[in-house]
Amino acid sequence: MKLNTKIACGTLCVLIFGGAYQHGAAQNNLLFSQSKVYAAANKENPQQTRAYIAQTYSQRDKLAPLAPGSLKLTGYFENDIQNSLTHWNKGVLPYARIADFFRNGRAQFALGEMWGKAVLSGAMLYRYTHDPELKTILQATVKDILTTVRENGSISCVPVSEQPDGKGGDLWERKYVLLALTTYYTYVEAAPEVLKAMIGEANSILDQIGDAPKHDIIEQGWSWNGIESSSVLEPIMRLYEITGDKRYLDFSKYVIDRGGCRNANIFTQALQNVPPHEMASGYPKAYEMNSVFNGLVEYYRMTGEEKWKTCFENYFRNIKQNEITIVGNGGADEPYYPKWAGEAWDNTAKEQANPKIKRMMETCIGVSWMKFCTYVLRTTADVSAADYIEKYIYNGLLGAMKPGGDGFSYVNLLNGDKVTNQGWGWDFDGLPVTCCNLNGPTGLAYIPYMAVMQSGNGPVVNLYNSFTAKALTAKKRNVEMVLKTEFPRSNKAELELTKLKSEKFSLTLRIPSWSKNTKVSVNGEPVKDVVAGKYLTLERKWNKGDKISITFDMKCRVIDAPIGSNPESANFQAVEYGPIVLARDENTDANYNAPVKFVTDDAGTMNITPVKPLLAGTRMEFEVPTANGKIRMSDYSSVNCWQGKKICTWIPRVR
């Protein structure tokens, strides 16, 4: 295979050869704008530029991420990202020992996923931080893993004679190796030996999996329906985007044609709007299913087959409606799938207050859902995808993270034992490494990826965490912006354009669905037609120093629990403040799960008072009025249950 690396910076002659460029990115205004900037900034590494552009832009995308290094968060999320980066990716993560699974074999199924997940999150975090210490760590572990390449080109935990090791999860493990290496190659170092290893890994899969006499993909995997193996679709499509080798596109079509799992076709089911918990023939494993649909989005981006856009949009809508809880994650054990330990779709949106639930909301589910929402947002500009990301990151994602930054909870309850390390994984001399410990940092890395994005007509603001950002105008000129805010502690934000040449272009703001009466002004002049749950596009001649002021409608809302299979769910209510879910904390309140009657107005809202938190590390705490006096509630994410205390998010009513 010959790679064309000639790049003329500032033109569309980035020369991504072959099918991927022809089908995906050609003659796209959005591609042109970002590729021009990225190529100019990275002209010393044309291979990496080509890989970045190939994977990042498609003519079908409505939005694109800003170029790496173009956004810097400050405050709320930045502290958490740095905490995790310092204490996990640059801290306790045992890179050498998880790489040894490929050298010495594994003691249980799927352990080979660990290396791929570690490098995937690290590479995505490097995309944001350009941290030199992190780069050195990643370079060392990639160099190490390349010494494990087997004679058929595979990086696998089992010898060639035992591949594909179906019940051992060999294909799933190799999927994660490919995801890690494509991400590393794109954002960290586009070394030729890495590209060679990616191609070798992919080609070894193509040699083994396919139509008879090869092994059938849906017969691979540890689960009885093999759904996890079809998630190889995403990295194979990424490699197609990088290389243009049509064999990878053909293989991806084969994966889709096989339906995603045994005894069901999850793509047909999504097209038919089958509820997610009824998909996949009795094993609707949520994390793995999300991973497969991430690959389907990539396939659509390159082929433009509208059928598949309808398919993933149906899946997206049905997950929103049927599975996502108030903290932005989903999946549970009761009532449908107790044997899957809280890791399956379970009609969770309706069942979330069911007192019989013992395990729910695996962190892997939440992160894969967030990633899928990001893909949907990029491809369709569906503003609800950003709403659901916001819901998850402020509540479920941060709520799963250990206070010390050195890991994430496996599953996450709304009432009772909020967090646990109990689940699939391996203990390294007292350090529990689980799938969720490894996936959590990837979720953090996707926050800056989508916080501010680029349309063909100007920047798009999706999140209101304070930031500095560099984007492009409609004429492809640089514009620099600063968002000043204490959100969500405050309901006010101010966006200032700090550097630009005067020009007419569009600046687009997401108006959150929870903010029913948002006020927006430009240089003091009120803006009309501001609608909750929509994008607000401000098209005008912008000048340096222009300011956009935003006031959110941060009413505190009391919501009744949805009622699913268990009528006892009707006995609970929850409290939301803007995007933040509040909870009672046994660490500070011995009566944390006692029934209360909230004092609300006719619209179900109430006046709460911010107070100084009783515990260090609590982000937000409020006095909340009840019929028997005020109680304290804090944000769900801050409730620390790692030392055995409990949480109450669905509050029992006074009967």
Tell me the role of every PLM-derived stretch.
Residues E298-N322, N354-D406:
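Catalytic-core region of carbohydrate-active enzymes that cleave or remodel glycosidic bonds
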Residues L30-F32, V37-Y38, N42-P46, S252, ...:
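C-terminal beta-rich recognition modules with glycine/proline-rich loops and embedded aromatic residues
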Residues G69-L71, G75-F77, K117-P132, Y176-A191, ...:
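Well-ordered alpha-helical scaffold segments within catalytic/enzyme domains
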Residues Q48-T49, D100-W115, V158-V177, G210-S229, ...:
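Solvent-exposed loop and edge beta-strand segments that line ligand/cofactor-binding
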Residues L71-G105, I137-S154, K196-H215, D250-A270, ...:
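Long, well-ordered core segments of solenoidal/helical folds
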Residues N104-Q108, L125-I266:
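Extended ligand-binding groove/face enriched in aromatic
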Residues M1-N29:
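Bacterial Sec-dependent N-terminal signal peptides
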Residues N28-M114, D131-V158:
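Low-complexity, Ser/Thr/Pro/Gly-enriched N-terminal "stalk/linker" regions
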